[in-house]
Amino acid sequence: MPRKTFKKLTTNDELISKVNPKNISLMEGFLREKSIRCAELTIKNYRSDLLVFFVWVLEFCENKLFTDIRKIEFSNFFSYATETMQWGSAKFARTKSTLSSFSNFIEKFYDDVYPEFRNIILRAVDSMPKELRREKTILTEEQVWDLLRHFSEKKEYQLVCWLSLAIGSGARFAELLRFTTDIIDENNLVFNDIFLETTQTIKTKGRTKSGKMLKKYIIKDIFLPHYERWLIERQKIMLKNGKEHNFIFIKKNGDIAKGSTVRSWCVKIEKYLEMPFYPHCSRHFIVTYLSRIGINADLIIELMGWSSVEMYKIYNDLSAKDREWKDLDKLKDSLDNDI
């Protein structure tokens, strides 16, 4: 079954056209300044968050200029967001951060126009306790191997190739669609010839406009057989439709696959599993799987391209009871000797 998150649209072109033009002008200046170093998706999210807020100001706060909005009015907006729009903690935190960044921008660049203005967001709005909005899916090894087998038997070769890349590399949703045939070389092996290393870097999530460029590591035996089988079918589709490009994943007409293509595969996987499935759970799976079989955390962090152990802790779903604790042998020996 699909994961469900409440979503209520509060903006449209007609309402946006009525928003205080000074607020729109400030927003556009903010986005231009941020676009120098922020990724396109970050800019898109900034714009979305600000427009939702400005439409609320239009409807409930007399279309005030942003610099005139009081602390209680910011608080009222976030109350409305949680009670009426049913925002979760992640959306709440992101929008709060957006409004705070926007305030800092005005304070820094428009101090001559609004000399009395100060960023009051952090003081006016308390953080929302983090909560799990969606049921977390923890895949077992048996489920993953069965998925690959089942969809191979169904001749869903592209779906299987995508899934094997997702669980074999731990790459994110957007990153998986950036993989191309020219960065996969079956002879470019590392770490005892167990992992394929991409021949070039790909754009991963990062704070800068260009993201973080990293080479990706893929467990060869999980991915390569399914990749090679899909390439045969892919070539047939490309020739039939007269298309030429090197992206691994494609639509039925040979065009480059989009997020909607992947989401359709996720629906098929969910129906077979009879439980929620989303691309990110494959990232949890590979980290947990490697941890369970005893791979050192330092190597896992290197494979994932992380800069700290904190991300490892987030994605490792092993409970304390699942892990092997060598120190327990010392306790057992002590009990055997002392009792």
Give, region by region, the residue ranges found by the protein language model.
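N-terminal core-binding DNA-recognition domain of tyrosine recombinases/integrases
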Residues: E28-K44, S48-R134
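Basic, Lys/Arg- and aromatic-enriched nucleic-acid-binding interface segment
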Residues: E141-F173
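C-terminal catalytic core of tyrosine-transesterase DNA break-rejoin enzymes
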Residues: S164, K268, R283-S307, I314
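Conserved tyrosine-mediated DNA breakage-rejoining catalytic core shared by Y-recombinases
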Residues: R178-L224
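Catalytic-site neighborhood detector that most strongly recognizes the C-terminal catalytic loop/helix
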Residues: M304-D329
